[in-house]
Amino acid sequence: VLANIKNQGINTNSQEVGAWLKGFVGSSIQDLYNASIYTNTDTRGWDIATRAIPMWGTTTVPATVNNGTVTANCNLYRALAKVNVWVNEKKGFEGFQLDKIVVSNQLDRGYCVSGKTPNSLIDVQYTEAYIPTNAQARGDVEYNCQSATTAFSDLIYLPEQLNNETQSVTLTVHYTYNGISKSKAISFSDHKWDIIRNHSYVFNISSVTPTTIECKLYYVVENWDEVTINIPDFN
């Protein structure tokens, strides 16, 4: 099952999705998957209110048909990861607010279907990123936090990415604490974690001082529920 591939920049010659898919008749399913590359170039970032996230999954269709209807269950994997920023486990700090978050170095495209094999445990899913060879870093995306005091959630979505010292997704958090505006950059490379599809990453601002903020990164895999799996220190 390949879902939500309309308006993803895949069929660049402006064909309708149906016509584009018919072009793969006689080709292998892998040829279709290799061509299913979405673009991530909107200056506002990925807005799920206007653009659905591509998803993929497999299922077995039963041979028995009930009154002309075939019913089957299918687990779908989202092609993007989600990033949230919390303030003190969503409890906030007195005098602290988030002003804006600038995301740098995210990639400009990604595969709708991963070429990696998902883990057999459904709660683990994919453990490796799968990235188009022509993917490259795109321009910064700025998110207005509208003076949020406890969290900025469910608004930052990113393609898969390998994070290292030379190219890593970075969030620059602009904030105000007791009337003084400051900013701090937090990077995925500091945690040695890649960005993997269908995962949720939570940066929790665990403490604030007059000069800086300290963060910890939560790594979440279970259906995007915000359940703590591991909490390495952010230093």
Regions found by a protein language model. Give the residues of each.
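A generic structural signal for beta-strand entry/edge sites
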Residues: 69-71, 168, 200
